[in-house]
Amino acid sequence: MLFALAAIVAAVGFIAKPAEISSANTEEVKWLTYDQAVALSKKNPKPFFIDVYTDWCGWCKQMDKNTFSNHKVAAYLNKHFYSIKLNPEKADSVHYKGVAMTNGALAAKIFHATSYPTTVYLEGDETLLQPIPGYQDPNDLYRIIHYIGENHYKTTTWDDFSRTFTETAE
């Protein structure tokens, strides 16, 4: 009888575990508009992560499917950044440091994002840190967001950080 009870408890544990894992793996990036991120940053400063994309860009769609859907990437972005999706081909108006401009002007003139996808990193006060053009798989992006999200860029070179960073997005 004791053996049967132990077997049932163990079975319930195995059955319950996947549910915990699957719910933990479903975190999605909380995307904001640029102006929403600016307003939030005034109350609680965090760096900005900006995904500059277009609707026709195949690699942008791959980043949505493979990189931004990764639960560790999404959780880290949600905790350490204000994440923004910016389509430069939309005529939406945004306010960069109080000046109204279109998405396209902001992406090209301020963020130097002229190819897609490009990820752009800003300080909480909208100071440009770095645009990074091209597709980034989950592990590549995970390394970069740790470098910026934990302010390693202020004290450590990218090469030194990259050599010692061993975490993965898997």
Regions found by a protein language model. Give the residues of each.
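Typically the conserved alpha-helix immediately C-terminal to a functionally engaged Cys/Sec
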Residues: 60-78
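Structural alpha/beta surface segment adjacent to cysteine/selenocysteine redox centers
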Residues: 80, 86-114
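Short active-site neighborhood of thiol/selenol oxidoreductases, capturing the structured segment around
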Residues: 43-58, 83
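Bacterial Sec-dependent N-terminal signal peptides
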Residues: 1-23
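A short beta-strand-turn-helix
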Residues: 30-47, 77
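Solvent-exposed loop/turn segments at secondary-structure junctions
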Residues: 54-59, 67, 88-92, 126-127
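Flexible coil segments in periplasmic/lumen-exposed cytochrome c-class electron-transfer proteins
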Residues: 152-170
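Non-catalytic, surface beta->alpha helical segment in thiol-disulfide oxidoreductase systems
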Residues: 109-154
